[in-house]
């Protein structure tokens, strides 16, 4: 943000001496926003006390407050905003009893944050960057021409300080507002998924795509102009290297370079973080869908029931008792009804026992990676394991390998938010998507 010429103790003493304080409950803030909105509709930029009372009446009605004491409460609210330096009051003998009010810079700043700054516009950003590029080019040309100290102050330092730096601060503020909007979108998505994830999928997709598009649009605009801006800053910096009396210009250029680097780098980092969050939400939705194994049958059954009178149907089933006992926990006890008695010399192993044996074997073989600190490429390891088993067991073995591998450690590349490449793990089209595990 903007640099401060005063030290921290000086600023603290100044604020204490002037008794600065801001207290804006929701009704006071709403009143201030109403004043700013109505004030924006007037060419002269000023409002009478009667107009302020009318604005307060709208706020009072919205908060369902009594109308009997509205004049007194409006007067208190106006005086409160004047006391907090959010409104300026002007009186004269001609307009005695009917003062004129104007918003202060502080009042404009607060209302501008809540009203205008939340409206992201790529056109607005492009215009700001165009103005910055023009100012920087003019300053760079003046710096290469050279001149006395007055020339440097007027044609180089002043445009950089009071035009370029302020626009950089405005862009930085836009990014911080985008950060806040991302948090609000995340809260909205969390509420949607907590209510009904099926109905929320389309809404979540819309919120995710809109935010991703806005971030990408912002970053593309910054990337397109960033190199030209840095080039002009370097031109000014090169022109000051031969002068010992231009430290103030050199320091300002360095600050602007740091701001520009921070703006561009944070824009890219925000996109990477949002990509990671996007993947997290989609993974949650996919997991929820995978848990609903019968979703297709259930959906068709609901549709069939709803359209029964238009398209009647009949359900035919066999072995009614068996159908009713499908979820019977003791069903395994009746296996002999199907298989009959087994010969004494025939050994039978349950799938769970085989799975436990495989898991123990795979766990022992994978432990070597953790003990020696060797990076574990899940694609190569899974392919080696699957080559030892018949095709019918590939799915179960691959699942065990993945389960055991993720228990050993994590991949630091997962924290970048970038997707891993798909790697084939057998000759039948099976693939796995995972980063190399390198932190145990």
From Swiss-Prot:
GO molecular function (one): calcium ion binding
Keywords, sorted A to Z: Calcium, Cell cycle, Cell division, Chromosome partition, Cytoplasm, DNA condensation
Annotated InterPro entries: Chromosome_partition_MukF, MukF_C, MukF_C_sf, MukF_M, MukF_M_sp, MukF_WHTH, WH-like_DNA-bd_sf, WH_DNA-bd_sf
A single GO BP: cell division
Alphabetized SUPFAM superfamilies for the sequence: MukF C-terminal domain-like (SSF140570), Winged helix' DNA-binding domain (SSF46785)
Coarse class of the protein's main subcellular location: cytoplasm
Entry keyword annotation includes Oxidoreductase: no
Region of interest called Leucine-zipper, as start-end residue ranges on this chain: 208-236
Pfam families on file: KicB, MukF_C, MukF_M
Cellular compartment(s): Cytoplasm, Nucleoid
Domain of life assignment: Bacteria
Gene3D superfamilies according to UniProt: Chromosome partition protein MukF, middle domain, MukF, C-terminal domain, Winged helix-like DNA-binding domain superfamily/Winged helix DNA-binding domain
Subunit structure: Interacts, and probably forms a ternary complex, with MukE and MukB via its C-terminal region. The complex formation is stimulated by calcium or magnesium. It is required for an interaction between MukE and MukB.
Described purpose of this protein according to its UniProt entry: Involved in chromosome condensation, segregation and cell cycle progression. May participate in facilitating chromosome segregation by condensation DNA from both sides of a centrally located replisome during cell division. Not required for mini-F plasmid partitioning. Probably acts via its interaction with MukB and MukE. Overexpression results in anucleate cells. It has a calcium binding activity.
NCBIfam families: PRK05260.1
Family assignment from sequence similarity: Belongs to the MukF family.
Protein name in UniProt: Chromosome partition protein MukF
Organism, as annotated: Klebsiella pneumoniae (strain 342)
């Amino acid at each position: 943000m903007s640099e401060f010429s005063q030290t921290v103790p000086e600023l603290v003493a100044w604020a204490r001496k002037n008794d600065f304080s801001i207290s804006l409950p929701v009704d006071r803030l709403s009143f201030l926003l109403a004043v700013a909105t109505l004030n924006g509709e007037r060419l002269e930029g000023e409002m009478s006390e009667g107009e302020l009372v009318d604005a307060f009446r709208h706020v009072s009605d919205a908060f369902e407050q009594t109308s009997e004491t509205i004049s007194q409460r409006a007067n208190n609210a106006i005086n409160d905003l004047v006391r907090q330096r959010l409104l300026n009051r002007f009186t004269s003998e001609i307009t005695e009893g009917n003062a004129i009010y104007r918003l202060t810079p502080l009042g404009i700043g607060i209302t501008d944050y809540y009203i205008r700054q939340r409206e992201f516009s790529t056109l607005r950003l492009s215009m700001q960057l165009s103005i910055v590029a023009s100012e920087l080019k003019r300053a760079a040309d003046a710096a290469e021409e050279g001149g006395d100290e007055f020339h440097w102050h007027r044609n180089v330092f002043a445009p950089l300080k009071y035009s370029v730096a302020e626009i950089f601060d405005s862009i930085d503020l836009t990014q911080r507002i985008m950060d806040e909007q991302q948090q609000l979108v995340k809260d909205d998505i969390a509420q949607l998924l907590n209510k009904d994830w099926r109905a929320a999928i389309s809404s979540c997709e819309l919120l995710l795509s809109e935010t991703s598009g806005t971030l990408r649009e912002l970053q593309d605009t910054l990337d397109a102009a960033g190199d030209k801006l840095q080039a002009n800053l370097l031109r000014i910096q090169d022109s000051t290297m031969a002068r010992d009396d231009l430290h103030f210009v050199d320091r300002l250029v360095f600050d602007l370079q740091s701001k520009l680097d921070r703006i561009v780098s944070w824009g890219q980092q925000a996109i990477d973080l949002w990509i990671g969050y996007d993947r997290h939400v989609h993974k949650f939705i996919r997991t929820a869908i995978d848990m609903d194994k019968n979703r297709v049958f259930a959906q068709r059954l609901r549709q069939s029931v709803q359209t029964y009178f238009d398209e009647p149907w009949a359900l035919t089933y066999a072995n009614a008792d068996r159908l009713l006992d499908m979820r019977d926990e003791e069903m395994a006890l009746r296996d002999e009804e199907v298989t009959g008695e087994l010969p004494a010399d025939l050994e039978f192993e349950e799938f769970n026992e085989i799975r436990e044996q495989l898991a123990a074997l795979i766990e022992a073989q994978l432990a070597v990676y953790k003990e020696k600190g060797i990076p574990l490429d899940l694609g190569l390891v899974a392919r080696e394991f699957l080559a030892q088993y018949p095709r019918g067991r590939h799915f179960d073995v691959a699942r065990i390998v993945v389960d055991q591998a993720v228990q050993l450690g994590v991949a630091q590349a997962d924290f970048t938010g970038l997707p891993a490449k798909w790697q084939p793990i057998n000759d039948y089209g099976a693939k796995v998507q995972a980063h190399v595990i390198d932190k145990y």
